C-alpha cells in the first residue's frame, strides 16, 4: 500500500559521474543574481492571544531592460467573417492501362470509348480553383464573400478515403515554387515515393483492415507566406498547396501475380530507318528507295499480316494478268521441301552479309512462303488505297505519299509485326528485353523529336524534354503529359516521337561510337496494325499517315512504368481516390451597410421559408478593393463621384459560354529555364538591328564600315519601326505591372514572388526580347 509506494520512491545512492548526454562545453555566463539584504521580521498578535511571525513583501527593484522582441500589430477591417470551403473531389481516377498518365492533365477529357484518367496526379489548389469547383457544384462555402474584398488564409484539412482494394501514396507540398520539372513525375512513381520520408501511405481496406476508413492530414499555409490581410485578387491565383498522388500495390510490390516474369518486351526500329525517319515531303525519294528494298526482301512476308493487308487487295481484282484477274494462290510458293537448292537475299539498309535461305516453302527451315511475284503488291496496294483516301476526303486531305500508307508503306504490319511464321525469322525491327531490377539509370536517356527531324540523334536544340540518368521505369512515369506542358503543344502525341537510349536492355540500346544515337520503340498493337488498346478500327485519315508517334508509343511507356517496384498493375477496370477538403478563410472589409425593408402587410404566414437560403458567392478575380463600395465612399447618404467613376470601370458579365479550357486549372505549371524563355521570345520577336547613326568623332573608316553594314541589312526601315513599336508596347505593359507591384509593396500588400504564378513575379517582368 502506502509503504510500497514510498519504497518505490527511494533511490539508491550512486557515485557521481558525468552523463554522456550532458553538454561538456562551457555555457554562456549568466547574469549575476541581485543580492538582497536580510528580511526584517514583523510580529503581529493574532486573535486568540498567540503571536505569529509575518514577513513583509519587498518590491524587487532592478535596472529596466529593453524587450528582445516587439509585437507588430495590424489593424483589422471593421467587418470579419469566417468561411470554410468544404468539398469533395477525386484526386485521381485510373482506368485500365493508364497508370503512367497524369490524371490532372486528363481530368477534363471527353474521349469515349476508352480508358479514362491516369495513375498519378499533380494537383494544385488556388482560390480561383475553389471558386471554379463551386460553380461545378463540387463544394459549398459557409459564408459569403460579397462586398468583402480582403481575405486571410488559415490552412486546410484534407481527408483521404481508403479504397477497398487499391493502395495509394500521397505527398503534400507547400514549398514554392509549385512548378513541374523533368524530375517531378519520376519522383511520384511508387518506387520513388516509397523511399521518401515525407510521403504518406494510404493502404486499402484489404491491406490494413480494422482501421478508420479515412486519413486526416492538417496542412498549413505555404512556406514564406506572411499571414496578413490581402485583397482577394492577389490571393486568387496564388498556389496554396500541391498534392502528388499515385496508385500503388503493397501486396505485390515486385510484379503482378498474373504474369510469369518481370521482364518487359518491346520492339524498336532497325537502323535501316535512321535516315528516312522524317515525314517531310522532301525526303520522299529516300523513303521510296528504302521501301523498294524492304519489299524486295521476300523473308519479310513470312507472317500472317501479309494475308491481312494484301489478300483483300487481290480478291477485289485489282491485279490482272492479261484479261483475267490474278488470284492469291498465284503468289504462294509451291516448291516442295528440299535441301538441294538455296538462294541469297540482301538484307535492306544495312551492311549485313547476304542471308542464305532455301527455295522451298517450309518456313521452319528458312524457306519462303511466297514467291517473287509478291514484291510488287505492297507498293501497288499503297498507291490504290491512297487514291481512294484522297477521293473520299477531298480538299481536306493534303498527303500524297504512298510510302507512309497503312497497308504497304514503310511502317506496314507486314514488316513490323512481331509474330513471324518462324520465331527465328527477323523482321524490320529488333526485339528488346528489359529487366527493371537491373537498371541503375546511368547512361539512360529519354527524349522526343518532332516528326520532321531527319535523324535519330539527340540534339540540344531540336530535341526536347530530355530525362537522363534515371531508371526507365521512373522516367516513363507521366512523361507524355510533361512533354505536352513543356512544349505547349496539346497535340504532341501526334506531332512527336519518342527515342530511348539505355545500356540496361538486352540487346543494349546504344551505339558506342555514337553516344547521341537513339532508338524509336513502338507498341505491339502498332506492329500488328492496330490502335492502342487492340482495336482494329483504324480511322481512314490515320491509315493514310501511318508512322510511329507518341500516340502509338504510349503502351511502351505504360509497360515500363508498370514494371517498377510498388507500381500498380491495373488489375481493376477503374479505381479512384476520393478526398474531402476544408479550406479555412476569413473574409474582411468595410462594406456599406445594406438595409433591407420589406412590406409587413404582404406576409401572410409567420413561419420561415422552406427553401434553404443560398449564399451569394462572388468571383475572387473581380472582388478587388477598386470594384467594391466601402464605408468611406458613402457621404451624406450619397456615393461620391470618385466612387461612382471607379465602379463604372467594372467589367460586365457576358452570357457567352465558352467550350472550356484546353487544360484543367488543377494541373500544375511546368518550369521553363531562362534560356528556353529567351529562345521562345526570340522566335516571336526577332532582335531588331537599328540603322546606326555615325557620331562625328569617328573616323572615315568607321563611317565606311557602318555604311556597309547598313547596306547589308535585309530588313527595311518600316519593318524595323513596326518591330520597335511592338516591343515598346510590351515594355509599356511590363512597366505598368512593375509600378503596380511597387505600389503593393508600399501598401504592405506584397506577396513573396515564389508564391505567385508563373509570370506574376517581378523577375519575369524584365524578360524582354533582346
Curated annotation (Swiss-Prot):
The keyword Transferase does not apply. It comes from the Viruses. Residues 703-717 have a biased composition (Low complexity). Residues 666-681 have a biased composition (Basic and acidic residues). GO terms for cellular component: T=1 icosahedral viral capsid. Keywords: Capsid protein, T=1 icosahedral capsid protein, Virion. Self-assembles to form an icosahedral capsid with a T=1 symmetry, about 30 nm in diameter, and consisting of 60 capsid proteins. The capsid encapsulates the genomic DNA. Capsid protein is involved in attachment and entry into the host cell. Residues 646-656 have a biased composition (Polar residues). This is Capsid protein. It is found in: Virion. Belongs to the anelloviridae capsid protein family. Residues 645-682, 697-717 are annotated as: Disordered. The keyword Repeat does not apply. Its main location: virion.
Amino acid at each position: 500500500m502506502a509503504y510500497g509506494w514510498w519504497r518505490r520512491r527511494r533511490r539508491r545512492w550512486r557515485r557521481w559521474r558525468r552523463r554522456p548526454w550532458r553538454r561538456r562545453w562551457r555555457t554562456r555566463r549568466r547574469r549575476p543574481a541581485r543580492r538582497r539584504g536580510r528580511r526584517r521580521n514583523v510580529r503581529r498578535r493574532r486573535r486568540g492571544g498567540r503571536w505569529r511571525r509575518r514577513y513583509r513583501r519587498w518590491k524587487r527593484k532592478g535596472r529596466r531592460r529593453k524587450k528582445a522582441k516587439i509585437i507588430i500589430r495590424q489593424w483589422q477591417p471593421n467587418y470579419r467573417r469566417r468561411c470554410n470551403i468544404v468539398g469533395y473531389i477525386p484526386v485521381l481516377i485510373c482506368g485500365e492501362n493508364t497508370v503512367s498518365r497524369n490524371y490532372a492533365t486528363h481530368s477534363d477529357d471527353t474521349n469515349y470509348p476508352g480508358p479514362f484518367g491516369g495513375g498519378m496526379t499533380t494537383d494544385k489548389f488556388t482560390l480561383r480553383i475553389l471558386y471554379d469547383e463551386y460553380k461545378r457544384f463540387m463544394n459549398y462555402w459557409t459564408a459569403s464573400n460579397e462586398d468583402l474584398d480582403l481575405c486571410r488564409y488559415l490552412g486546410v484539412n484534407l481527408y483521404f478515403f481508403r479504397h477497398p482494394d487499391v493502395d495509394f501514396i500521397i505527398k503534400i507540398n507547400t514549398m514554392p515554387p509549385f512548378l513541374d520539372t523533368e524530375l517531378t513525375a519520376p519522383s511520384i512513381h511508387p518506387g520513388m515515393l516509397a523511399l521518401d520520408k515525407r510521403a504518406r501511405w494510404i493502404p486499402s481496406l484489404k491491406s490494413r483492415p480494422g482501421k478508420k476508413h479515412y486519413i486526416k492530414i492538417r496542412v498549413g499555409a505555404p512556406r514564406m507566406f506572411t499571414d496578413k490581410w490581402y485583397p482577394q485578387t492577389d490571393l486568387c491565383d496564388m498556389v496554396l498547396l500541391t498534392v502528388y498522388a499515385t496508385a500503388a500495390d503493397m501486396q505485390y510490390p515486385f510484379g503482378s501475380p498474373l504474369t510469369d516474369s518481370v521482364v518487359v518486351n518491346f520492339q524498336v526500329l532497325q537502323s535501316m530507318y535512321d535516315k528516312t525517319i522524317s515525314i517531310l515531303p522532301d525526303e520522299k525519294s529516300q523513303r521510296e528507295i528504302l521501301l523498294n528494298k524492304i519489299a524486295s526482301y521476300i523473308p519479310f512476308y513470312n507472317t500472317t499480316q501479309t494475308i491481312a493487308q494484301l489478300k483483300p487487295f487481290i480478291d477485289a481484282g485489282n491485279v490482272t494478268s492479261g484479261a483475267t484477274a490474278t488470284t492469291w494462290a498465284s503468289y504462294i510458293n509451291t516448291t516442295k521441301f528440299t535441301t538441294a537448292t538455296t538462294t541469297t537475299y540482301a538484307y535492306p539498309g544495312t551492311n549485313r552479309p547476304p542471308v542464305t535461305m532455301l527455295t522451298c516453302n517450309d518456313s521452319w527451315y528458312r524457306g519462303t512462303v511466297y514467291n517473287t511475284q509478291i514484291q510488287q503488291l505492297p507498293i501497288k496496294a499503297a498507291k490504290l488505297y491512297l487514291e481512294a483516301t484522297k477521293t473520299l476526303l477531298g480538299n481536306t486531305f493534303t498527303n500524297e505519299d504512298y510510302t507512309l500508307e497503312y497497308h504497304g508503306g514503310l511502317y506496314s504490319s507486314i514488316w513490323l509485326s512481331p509474330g513471324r511464321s518462324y520465331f527465328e525469322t527477323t523482321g524490320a525491327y529488333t526485339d528488346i528485353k528489359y529487366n527493371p531490377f537491373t537498371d541503375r539509370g546511368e547512361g539512360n536517356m529519354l527524349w522526343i523529336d518532332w516528326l520532321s527531324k531527319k535523324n535519330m540523334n539527340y540534339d540540344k536544340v531540336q530535341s526536347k524534354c530530355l530525362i537522363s540518368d534515371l531508371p526507365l521505369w521512373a522516367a516513363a512515369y507521366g512523361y507524355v503529359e510533361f512533354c505536352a506542358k513543356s512544349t505547349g503543344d496539346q497535340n504532341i502525341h501526334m506531332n512527336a516521337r519518342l527515342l530511348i537510349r539505355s545500356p540496361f536492355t538486352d540487346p543494349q540500346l546504344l551505339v558506342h561510337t555514337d553516344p547521341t544515337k537513339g532508338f524509336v520503340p513502338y507498341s505491339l498493337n502498332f506492329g500488328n496494325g492496330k490502335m492502342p488498346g487492340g482495336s482494329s478500327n483504324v480511322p481512314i485519315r490515320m491509315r493514310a499517315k501511318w508512322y510511329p508517334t507518341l500516340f502509338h508509343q504510349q503502351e511502351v511507356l505504360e509497360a515500363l512504368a508498370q514494371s517498377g517496384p510498388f507500381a500498380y498493375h491495373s488489375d481493376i477496370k477503374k479505381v479512384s481516390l476520393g478526398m474531402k477538403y476544408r479550406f479555412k478563410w476569413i473574409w474582411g472589409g468595410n462594406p456599406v451597410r445594406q438595409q433591407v425593408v420589406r412590406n409587413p402587410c404582404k406576409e401572410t404566414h409567420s413561419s420561415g421559408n422552406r427553401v434553404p437560403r443560398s449564399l451569394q458567392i462572388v468571383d475572387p478575380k473581380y472582388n478587388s478593393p477598386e470594384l467594391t463600395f466601402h464605408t468611406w465612399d458613402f457621404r451624406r447618404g450619397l456615393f461620391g463621384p470618385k466612387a461612382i467613376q471607379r465602379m463604372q470601370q467594372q467589367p460586365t458579365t457576358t452570357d457567352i459560354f465558352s467550350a472550356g479550357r484546353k487544360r484543367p486549372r488543377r494541373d500544375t505549371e511546368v518550369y521553363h529555364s531562362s534560356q528556353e524563355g529567351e529562345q521562345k521570345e526570340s522566335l516571336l520577336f526577332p532582335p531588331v538591328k537599328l540603322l546606326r547613326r555615325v557620331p562625328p568623332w569617328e573616323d572615315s573608316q568607321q563611317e565606311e564600315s557602318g555604311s556597309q553594314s547598313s547596306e547589308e541589312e535585309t530588313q527595311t526601315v518600316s519593318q524595323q519601326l513596326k518591330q520597335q513599336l511592338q516591343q515598346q508596347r510590351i515594355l509599356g505593359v511590363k512597366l505598368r505591372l512593375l509600378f503596380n507591384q511597387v505600389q503593393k509593396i508600399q501598401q504592405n500588400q506584397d506577396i513573396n514572388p515564389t508564391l505567385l504564378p508563373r509570370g506574376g513575379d517581378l523577375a519575369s517582368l524584365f524578360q524582354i526580347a533582346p
